[in-house]
C-alpha cells in the first residue's frame, strides 16, 4: 500500500507547509491586530537590491535601517489549509462582493492559512488570505464577509502595486538622513550624525506608516460600498472591528501610538464607517441563514482540526448531539488516535443527512487514513458524485482506489484523477497520485508527464524538463498529452537557460 504523504492532512483539511506568502509579525503591545495586506517593506526592498546601482551601498544602508524598523519579527512559513466545504463557503460568500468590486469571481480566490492569529491580507494578484484564527474569532459569516470586503478593496484599488508610492518617499527620507549623518560623522560630529540618522529613520518610517493607514482607510470605505452594493448588511464589519478593539484594550490602548501603526485604530475605523453602513438599505437585512449554518459547520470542523483534542472535547463535549458537535469530535478523535470513535461520529453525521456529500467525505477519509481503503471507497464515491467531482474530494477518492492495491480499481482511479487535475492543476498531491497509478498500470510515459506537471508547479524545472522529454519520446505525437509535455519541456528549458547559475551542476 502506498504510504500516506506526510503533507496530507487528516480528514478534509490538507496542509501545504511550503507556502510562505509574506513575513508576518504577531500583534504585541505596540501593534494592534487588524486586517493586514501586502508584502512587508523588507521583502519589497530585497527585490530592489537585485538591480545594480552606483549608489547601491548607500541605498543598502538606508534600506536596511528602514526595513529593520518596519519588520517587527522574522518571517516564518505559513501553511495553506485546503478543504472542499470551506472553499465552497468562501466562494459563495464572496461572489456578490467580488461582483460589487467590479472583479470576476473566476479570478478571485479566498485561501485559508493555518495561523491562529486574527488576520487577513492580500499579497499581490487576486487572492485573499484568511487566517484560521480569524475564522475562529468570528461569530458569524457576516463578519467574515466584512473582512473579505475590506481585502477586496485593496485588490480593486491596486494597493499592492501602489505600495512603492509609499515606500519610495520613506526610502528617500532615510537615505538623505544617512548621507547627512555620515557627513556629520566624517566632520567629527559623531553624536550629531547619529542623531540625524535616527531622526531620518523615524521620519521615513512615519512617512510609510501614514501612507499605509491611508490605504487601510480607503479599503475600509471600499469594503463598505461593496457590502451596500451587494445588499449585505455591514453589521458584521462593525462588530468585527469591535472585536479587534477589544484586543487593543487588552494590550492597553493608552500604550499604542496611533502614528506608529500600519492601520488606523479600530475605534477610528468604527467611527468613520458607522454612519455610512447604517445608512445603507441593507443595514437591517438579515444575514443569509443557509450561509450562517455553513459557517457554523466549518468553524466546528476547523476547531477539530487545528485545536488539541482536549480543547475540542471541552468545547464540544460528547453530550453535544448537534451537527457541530459530531463534526468537531470526528476530527478530534481522529487526531487523538481513536478511529472507532471518529467513525462513530461520522456515522452520526450521515444518519442525520445521508445525502450530505461532506459527511460522506469525512467518513471516507477517516476510514482511508485508518488503513481501510476498501471501506472508504463507497462514501468517497458518494462524496465525489455529490459535489459534482470536486477536485479535492475526487483526489482523495482516487487515493483510496489506489490504496486498495486492487488492479481492477486503477482504471477508475486514472479517470477520477484526470478529472481532478483538470479542474485543479495546482494540487501537487493529485499529480503525485495520478503519476503513481499510471506507474502501477505500466504507463510510464504518462507517469513521467504527471511527474513533470508536479515538478513544474513546484519550481523544479530540471526534473520537469527531464520527465517531460521522456513523456514526449513515448506518448503518441500531436495528442493532447504530447502537446502538454512539449509545453512543459520548453518552459522548463527556458527557465534553465535564463538562470544558468541556479541549475549549474555541483
Give the residues covered by each predicted segment.
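Extracytoplasmic and endomembrane cell-envelope/extracellular-matrix remodeling and assembly machinery
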Residues: 82-84, 88, 110, 207, ...
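Catalytic Zn2+-binding segment of zinc metalloproteases
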Residues: 152-169, 187
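Alpha-helical linker/edge segments of TPR/alpha-solenoid repeat scaffolds
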Residues: 270, 373-374, 406-410, 440-449, ...
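Helix-start (N-cap) detector for alpha-helical repeat units in TPR-like alpha-solenoids
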Residues: 323, 357-358, 391-392, 428-429, ...
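Residue at a conserved register position within TPR or TPR-like alpha-solenoid repeats
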Residues: 333, 367, 401-404, 438, ...
